[in-house]
Amino acid sequence: MDIRDKILKLKKEKGAIILAHYYQIPEIQEIADYVGDSYYLSKIAKDCEENIIVFCGVKFMAESAKILSPEKTVILPVMEAGCVMADMATEEGLAKLKEEHPNAKVVCYINSSTEVKALSDVCCTSSNAENIINNLEEKEIIFLPDRNLGSYIQEKTPDKKFILWNGFCIVHEAIQKEEILRLKREHEGILTVAHPECSKEIRDISDFIGSTSEIINFVNNSSNKKFIIITEEGVLHQLRKNGEEKEFYIPYGKMVCRNMKMTTLKDLYESLLKMENKIEIDEDLRLKAYNSLKNMHKLGG
């Protein structure tokens, strides 16, 4: 019995569900029950009947699942799989901003720690951030940790005043305008598709901007045959499954989030077999963080 069959057998025996983000390696995406972006997976984790969730992603995703469903066992196969951007936001810094802007609503990207979520009014993802900001009555918004997503939403909601945290995704931030222009010159008629975690200069030369799920939907529904995909290359697995006749180009030929790529089938199998790497959150902290995630599902549409 190969490891894939072992995982499927074990999953059935334990009554577990496997969730995987689009940035996971293809083998993990293929064995998962659900593959999606952060918002979609958070909804699945909240609503699923299974009491054991194996979350193949990074730590903040598994923590969000536990915050929403404390009665469920949430396993993160590789505990070291963190998020550099999430670590850029601190409780102390946010508390100071809240003191300086007492009338502002705090909107935190889901790519943030449980501690930051606990100090926030509402959480958001790249796919629902605009809806959430529009649904807030307050005009002043503290947005963290991603300055790029924040500035993108600011452009979409000009009636709001944003105080942006100076955080960013190291994978998306590394992309330079010159590389995109080079690819455009080399491939006539190519469409440029970017994640809002990209810098403004990249967004400004893109044909479409959206979350991972929105990127996949856009490409799947497009009659165009060539695309520059400016996000973590894990999305290519889904794009190639749905568009075998289409050509995809990644800046520099490589956009990899090392944390997202840590989880292997062996890690998945062993964590489920041994029931290791369970997410544990202090109940007082969880309740505070729960409010921001509850509001996300309420206001996110």
Curated annotation (Swiss-Prot):
GO molecular function, one term: quinolinate synthetase A activity
Enzyme class: transferase
Alphabetical GO biological process terms: 'de novo' NAD biosynthetic process from L-aspartate
EC number of this enzyme: 2.5.1.72
Cellular compartment(s): Cytoplasm
Keywords annotated in UniProt: 4Fe-4S, Cytoplasm, Iron, Iron-sulfur, Metal-binding, Pyridine nucleotide biosynthesis, Transferase
UniProt superkingdom: Bacteria
Coiled coil: none
This protein's pathway: Cofactor biosynthesis; NAD(+) biosynthesis; quinolinate from iminoaspartate: step 1/1
Alphabetical list of InterPro entries matching this protein: NadA (IPR003473), NadA_sf (IPR036094), Quinolinate_synth_type2 (IPR023066)
Annotated positions binding iminosuccinate: 21, 38, 109-111, 126, 195-197, 212
Cofactor binding, per record: Binds 1 [4Fe-4S] cluster per subunit.
Reaction(s) this enzyme catalyzes, per UniProt: iminosuccinate + dihydroxyacetone phosphate = quinolinate + phosphate + 2 H2O + H(+)
GO-annotated cellular components: cytosol
Positions contributing to [4Fe-4S] cluster binding: 83, 169, 257
Transmembrane segments: none
Protein function: Catalyzes the condensation of iminoaspartate with dihydroxyacetone phosphate to form quinolinate.
NCBIfam families in alphabetical order: nadA, PRK09375.1-2
Family to which the UniProt record says this protein belongs: Belongs to the quinolinate synthase family. Type 2 subfamily.
Name by which UniProt lists this protein: Quinolinate synthase
Gene: nadA
